[in-house]
From Swiss-Prot:
<feature type="binding site">
    <location>
        <position position="242"/>
    </location>
    <ligand>
        <name>ATP 1</name>
    </ligand>
</feature>
<feature type="binding site">
    <location>
        <position position="298"/>
    </location>
    <ligand>
        <name>Mg(2+) 2</name>
    </ligand>
</feature>
<dbReference type="InterPro" id="IPR005480">
    <property type="entry name" value="CarbamoylP_synth_lsu_oligo"/>
</dbReference>
<keyword id="KW-0665">Pyrimidine biosynthesis</keyword>
<keyword id="KW-0055">Arginine biosynthesis</keyword>
<feature type="binding site">
    <location>
        <position position="243"/>
    </location>
    <ligand>
        <name>ATP 1</name>
    </ligand>
</feature>
<feature type="binding site">
    <location>
        <position position="832"/>
    </location>
    <ligand>
        <name>Mn(2+) 3</name>
    </ligand>
</feature>
<keyword id="KW-0464">Manganese</keyword>
<feature type="region of interest" description="Oligomerization domain">
    <location>
        <begin position="402"/>
        <end position="546"/>
    </location>
</feature>
<feature type="binding site">
    <location>
        <position position="820"/>
    </location>
    <ligand>
        <name>Mg(2+) 3</name>
    </ligand>
</feature>
<keyword id="KW-0677">Repeat</keyword>
<dbReference type="GO" id="GO:0004087">
    <property type="term" value="F:carbamoyl-phosphate synthase (ammonia) activity"/>
</dbReference>
<comment type="subunit">
    <text>Composed of two chains; the small (or glutamine) chain promotes the hydrolysis of glutamine to ammonia, which is used by the large (or ammonia) chain to synthesize carbamoyl phosphate. Tetramer of heterodimers (alpha,beta)4.</text>
</comment>
<dbReference type="GO" id="GO:0006526">
    <property type="term" value="P:L-arginine biosynthetic process"/>
</dbReference>
<feature type="binding site">
    <location>
        <position position="834"/>
    </location>
    <ligand>
        <name>Mg(2+) 4</name>
    </ligand>
</feature>
<feature type="binding site">
    <location>
        <position position="832"/>
    </location>
    <ligand>
        <name>Mg(2+) 4</name>
    </ligand>
</feature>
<feature type="binding site">
    <location>
        <position position="777"/>
    </location>
    <ligand>
        <name>ATP 2</name>
    </ligand>
</feature>
């Protein structure tokens, strides 16, 4: 069927900010969809609130709106633009929920807008647990015994009938938010209450736990002619019970017999047909390992995290084709973009094994509960490709960016059998490593299978790795053993340690013996047809399929998995850099390992290598391609950390030299450079021992800011108020020694300013200066940023511009630099300089229209700023106000403290723009998920040092009609200031207390600041966590609170009696 001609304009709904459960995969799918629709001649309008994405670039769609994804704002855009149709299935759960809301509000009907791809009835049938169960019964497809519940009493009824354990699945939520497995009544109360709160329709499905079954996923496509295919099937190494986003996944499935494969394939196709989905869909199934009994777990009637993985695993671009199907094209009409010969109705075939391992944020949140269940906790993931599962798995392990090069962790070697058993049964992020350790210690596969029901096939693969370790250790210097180890994916790093040599020695030994990997192509058809895709993976085999051209090439290093501190912003910069390299006439080669991102879409670069970002894996590619050089500026700390080793191998680092990178990162060299340039910085010194640290802190005076050198996202950074806190930090947060010094600075409580600039060594161009709402001390990634600055005097702005230009030239920066300043007592100090792309590059690029990563790349390739039409100086400021607001995923991470500080905690960001600061802030806050009601109650519990500041805030809340609630101490201070307040009981009270008010939704805001100078009081922690669990905005910074007040005041009309007004005027006359 040809494409539809009765529609011209299509609105694509994006997925909003990155949160746990919804990461960069929707930037990839949304970008693909917009391009796909434009190819077909449609006018595309995009709405998304996330400025850090390629999707929100003006070139992606005909019109791009960066606005909050709420009914209020999306309706406004629909009424203004009058699209013929909307496509919500590429915007994740956010897009689907938005479509349902728009339909129910009547806006779509009012404006005559049709939903494309998946009909509203199909969305509701798949997402509403009750409707889905009914449909499965009609199809005769088995689902676990279950019950839809709307309150706790109904939950008790089901459990009494079926017994524990039961799984709670809330309706219309993302990444299993609010759900979990209940083994007893206490867990049932907690999880059901949470699930009902998080479900927008207050509905949960309770089902008998089938934990222990194999979890299998099918990624299926269907068109309007009822052609349906399986793009890829995947198997979770972790049995049912762990969310698929937190599971280690392999593709294609490894343990299914042909009969099982066909049985589940037929079921998946039957379900997509019954739902009438036109596009992509993900079906999750559970299979009993001892019989042919299976269950349908759930269906995602949209493009998902799994479809991004399936696209990258097979090379089959699901989102691109789903968009074409949505406008009426059929699979047998669409040419497969990979082979450019076959049609999209051919099911992909794989002649390799793909492994995906999630990347969790537990290195950031030491206190988080690491147990894995049905609620997702990973922020991102890595993927790797190999010719066997062992190779694929070990490549994925070293892609995780955790400093791990093998399936072993030193701290697990001490575990006894009982502890290992407990942790394997319970399942946490280290389970696979513990399985390997158990096998090393002689535990049998039978015992491990009994503990966690992991399939014997996977346990055998882990045992193969362990047996190979023994071989390697017993045969030092043996080339045959080395060859076998390399074929199994062992790293040079591991072999070097086993043979007591350096990694470089092993690398040289292999080269002398012609033991190097070849590169194979990902072609969707297992080499059955010739393919045109330049998409490769390494393996130890015979024939190399990556043909080196005679064009000059440049390698760009990607940023690896999405994690806190290094998000999709770096992928944005990477993609723009690749485009600039191509524009400059070079061949652009990218190395990355994140299946969710735009940079790993094979159509972006001239060549894509899907490989771990380690020195060994990167050097294999450089040895083959012999590029002009490597760009490390855009891949975050991942790429910067490889620069020194690459240079040791004789590789040219393009842009800022290694020496100058080091000068910005090394404390003493940086201090010397600032002194020479006459630029002030907070007093600080470097410590290499605990004793030194104590002495420095005494000399500088508390409070001090302590952090390790070479970090991203403020990892292990803290503000310390006294000596015992410093000792606690030195013991628990860092391992200090000569190679890993700790930086200790005077902590200045001032206004923080952030600047991004581009330097060519002679000229320094500054696209924008941003002001942070939160004072210095809150990580820049967690602060609300405002552009242009609202409270900087011209004199201070001039100082900042002068310092930026001096730093760009003085540090010999070629490319991008990011500087953080603090304004303290009307003086500008430099806190730090990052000689690379920062997380504000996409935000500023979009606002100012300066494509920063593109310009910087051309500078790196030798085209100076003047040639590109830019000179030295500050870009004229925009008239509108733009706000970048952080977005957190605290609801997914139990027992993590939500207090903001110097260590980054946000997972994503949104943008608000309007004519005034108040309006822009309102949009930014609403887009980030904070509800801003114009009246209600606010709970105030603050530390003594904040009481004075809190009084002014409380007074302003009172004046706009808010009801104030406070515990005795704060209430007394308020009463003394004649501010009406209601006293509430502290949380340790048996009577109705502060936590009850939060639980019952009787407070709209909670203001809670930390008591400094002692370990965080558990009371404060419980108040903050209770707020998160119950969806109440908890403000831990008084600066953020003031920003919200500005918005509330701008939305509220004043109401004063005439007498008050005349009294005020009389007072003014008397004192005039």
């Amino acid at each position: 069927m040809p494409k539809r001609l009765d529609i011209n304009t299509i609105l694509v709904i994006g997925s909003g900010p990155i949160v746990i459960g919804q990461a960069a995969e929707f930037d990839y799918s949304g970008t693909q969809a917009c391009q796909s629709l434009k190819e077909e001649g449609y006018k595309v309008i995009l709405v998304n609130s996330n400025p850090a994405t390629i999707m929100t670039d003006t070139a992606t769609a005909d019109k791009v709106y960066i606005e909050p994804l709420t009914l209020e704002f999306v309706s406004r855009i629909i009424r203004k633009e009058r699209p013929d149709a909307i496509l919500p299935t590429l915007g994740g759960q956010t897009g689907l929920n938005m479509a349902v809301e728009l339909a129910k509000s009547g806006v779509l009907e009012e404006c005559g807008v049709e939903i494309l791809g998946t009909k509203l009835s199909a969305i509701e049938q798949a997402e509403d647990r009750d409707l889905f169960r009914t449909l499965m019964q009609e199809l005769n497809e088995p689902t676990p015994p279950s019950e839809i519940i709307h309150n706790l009493d109904e939950a008790y009824g089901f459990v009494n009938e079926i017994g524990y354990p039961v799984i709670v699945r809330p309706a219309f939520t993302l990444g299993g938010t609010g759900g979990g497995i209940c083994h007893n009544e206490e867990e049932l109360i907690e999880i059901v209450t949470s699930g009902l709160k998080h479900s927008p329709v207050t509905q949960c499905l309770l089902e008998k736990s089938i934990a222990g079954c194999k979890e299998i996923e099918y990624e299926v496509m269907r068109d309007s002619n009822d052609n349906a295919i399986v793009v890829c099937n995947m198997e979770n190494i972790d049995p049912v019970g762990v969310h698929t986003g937190d599971s280690i996944v392999v593709a294609p499935s490894q343990t299914l017999s042909d009969r099982e494969y066909q049985m589940l394939r037929n079921t998946s196709l039957r379900i997509i047909r019954a739902l009438g989905i036109e596009g992509g869909c993900n079906v999750q199934l559970a299979l009993d390992p001892y019989s042919f009994q299976y269950y349908v777990i759930e269906v995602n009637p949209r493009v998902s995290r799994s479809s991004a993985l399936a696209s990258k695993a097979t090379g089959y671009p699901i989102a691109k084709l789903a968009a074409k199907i949505a406008v009426g094209l059929t699979l047998d009409e669409i040419v497969n973009p990979v082979t450019q010969k076959t049609y999209a109705c051919f099911e992909p075939a794989l002649d390799y094994v793909v492994s995906k391992i999630p990347r969790w944020p537990f290195d950031k949140f030491e206190s988080a509960n690491r147990t894995l269940g049905t609620q997702m906790k990973a922020t991102g993931e890595v993927m790797s490709i190999g010719r066997n599962l062992e190779e694929s798995l070990l490549k994925a392990v070293r892609s995780l960016e955790l400093g791990i090069y093998h399936l072993e962790l030193d701290h697990l070697k001490e575990l006894d059998k009982e502890t290992m058993k407990k942790r394997i049964i319970k399942a946490d992020d280290e389970r696979l490593f513990i399985v390997a350790e158990a096998i090393r210690q002689g535990v049998t596969k039978e015992e491990i299978n009994e503990w966690c029901e992991m399939d014997f096939f996977f346990l055998q693969k882990v045992e193969n790795i362990v047996n190979m370790e023994r071989e390697v250790k017993a045969n030092v210097g043996n080339m045959e053993v080395l060859q076998t180890a390399k074929e199994m994916g062992f790293s040079d790093h591991y072999i070097a340690a086993a043979w007591n040599k350096t990694e470089r020695e092993i690398y040289d030994m292999r080269k002398e013996n012609n033991m190097t990997p070849v590169f194979k192509m990902v072609d969707t058809c297992a080499a059955e047809f010739e393919s045109a895709t330049p998409y490769y993976y390494s393996t130890y085999a015979d024939e190399n399929e990556s043909i080196v051209t005679d064009r000059k090439s440049v390698v760009v290093l990607g940023s690896g998995p999405i994690r806190i501190g290094q998000g999709v912003e770096f992928d944005y910069a990477t993609v723009h850099s690749v485009w600039a390299i191509k524009e400059a006439g070079y061949e652009a080669i990218i190395i990355n390992n994140n299946p969710e991102t735009v940079s790993t879409d094979f159509s972006i670069s001239d060549k894509l290598y899907f490989e771990p970002l380690t020195i060994e894996d990167v050097m294999h590619i450089i040895d083959l391609e012999k590029p002009e050089g490597v760009i490390v500026q855009f891949g975050g700390q991942t790429a910067i950390n490889l620069a020194a080793k690459l240079e040791e191998h004789g590789v040219k680092i393009l842009g800022t030299s290694l020496e100058d990178l080091d000068r910005a990162e090394d404390r003493d060299k940086f201090e010397a450079a600032l002194t020479k340039l006459g630029i002030p910085q907070p007093v600080g010194k470097t410590a290499t021992t605990v004793e030194q640290a104590v002495a420095i802190a005494e000399e500088i005076g508390y409070p001090v800011l302590v952090r390790p050198s070479y970090v991203l996202g403020g990892r292990a950074m803290e503000i310390v108020y006294r000596q015992e806190e410093l000792l606690h930090y030195m013991k628990n947060a860092v391992k200090v020694h000569a190679d890993h010094p700790v930086l200790i600075d005077r902590y200045m409580v001032g206004k923080e300013i952030e600047v991004d600039a581009i330097s060519d060594g002679e000229n320094v161009f500054i696209p924008g200066i941003m002001e942070h709402i939160e004072r210095a001390g809150v990580h820049s990634g967690d602060s609300i940023g405002v552009y242009p600055p609202q409270s900087l005097s011209e004199k201070l702005k001039e100082q900042i511009i002068e310092h930026t230009i001096a730093l760009g030239k003085g540090l010999n920066i070629v490319g991008l630099l990011n500087i953080q300043f603090v304004v303290f007592k009307d003086q500008v100090y430099v806190i730090e300089v990052n000689p690379r792309a920062s997380r504000t590059v996409p935000f500023l690029s979009k606002i100012t229209g300066v494509p920063m990563a593109n310009v910087a790349t051309k500078v790196i390739l030798g085209q100076d700023l003047v040639e590109q039409g830019y000179g030295t100086g500050y870009h004229p400021e925009e008239k509108e106000v733009y706000v970048k607001a952080p977005v957190f995923s605290f609801a997914k991470l139990r027992s993590v403290d939500t207090t903001l500080g110097p260590e980054m905690k946000s997972t994503g960001e949104v943008m608000g723009k309007d004519l005034t600061l108040e309006k822009a802030l309102y949009k930014g806050l609403v887009a980030s998920g904070i509800n801003i009601p114009t009246h209600g109650s606010v709970i105030i519990t603050v530390a003594d040092k904040d009481k004075e500041e809190a009084m002014e805030i409380a007074k302003r809340f009172h004046e706009i009609g808010y009801n104030l609630l406070a515990t005795a101490g704060t209430a007394q201070s308020l009463t003394e200031q004649n501010i009406p307040v209601q006293v509430v009981n502290k949380i340790d009270s048996e009577d109705y207390n502060l936590l009850d008010i939060i639980r019952q939704g009787k407070a709209q805001f909670v203001i809670n600041t930390l008591t400094k100078g002692k370990q965080p009081a558990r009371d404060g922690f419980r108040i903050r966590r209770e707020s998160v669990e119950n969806g109440v905005a908890c403000l831990t910074s008084l600066d953020t609170t003031r920003a919200i007040l500005r918005v509330l005041e701008s939305m509220t009309f004043s109401a004063h009696s005439m007498k008050e007004i005349t009294q005020t005027k009389r007072h003014e006359v008397v004192h005039a």
